[in-house]
Amino acid sequence: CTFIFVSYVFSKTNNKWFDRWSCERLIKYKAVIFGSIGTIVETSNIQRKSFNKAFKEFGLDWYWSTSEYKKLLEKSGGENRLSKYANKKNIKINTKKLRDLKTKFFNDYLKKNKIKPRAGVLNIINFCKKNNIKLGFATSTTVNNINSIFFTLKNTINKKDFNFIGNNKLVLREKPYPDIYMITLKKLKIRPKECLAIEDTEESMKSALKAKIRCVAFPGKLH
């Protein structure tokens, strides 16, 4: 298996395991930046179920099927996704409160269940640590989500593995804007050409590419 580098075209053929041979190609970089939670763990279906549970408790008759949620994932931002969906349904709701409820269900699930890292992720992290390559996590999700992810991964991956971890409080604009990547570059004290980003969606890849960072596509099951 090899890394497949892309420009603005997101190819589903890029979902390959990162083996040792692939990791050795990282040696020329000063940093590797994981861009989203989905590049480390597969959570899309858990999040979909958490949304549906929140809808039910909120008194909404909404239900996101796997195929519908897959289409919704083409755009970043949970609250933004909810706002557009509510407008489509011509319903006024408190999207922040609804998203917070979904986040609670999502985090509750992660605290009670263990999730393994995606195939190859541990190889990358261990290789980078062994070769003094910095690790960044350019996520713009909530701190609660980040904490829950690392809680469920505590026996395999932890926060200390990363030199910098982003969150939604650090940026005003979500992906595909490059803001979170610009902050990550600054915190890691590196230039765009000195690092490689890994993203799981086309929308998120645009964020890295706009920051002039080379990016590899690593799509999840619903992307």
Regions found by a protein language model. Give the residues of each.
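Amphipathic coiled-coil/heptad-repeat helices and related helical stalk/stem segments
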Residues: 120-121, 201
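Short active-site oxyanion
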Residues: 133-136, 193-194
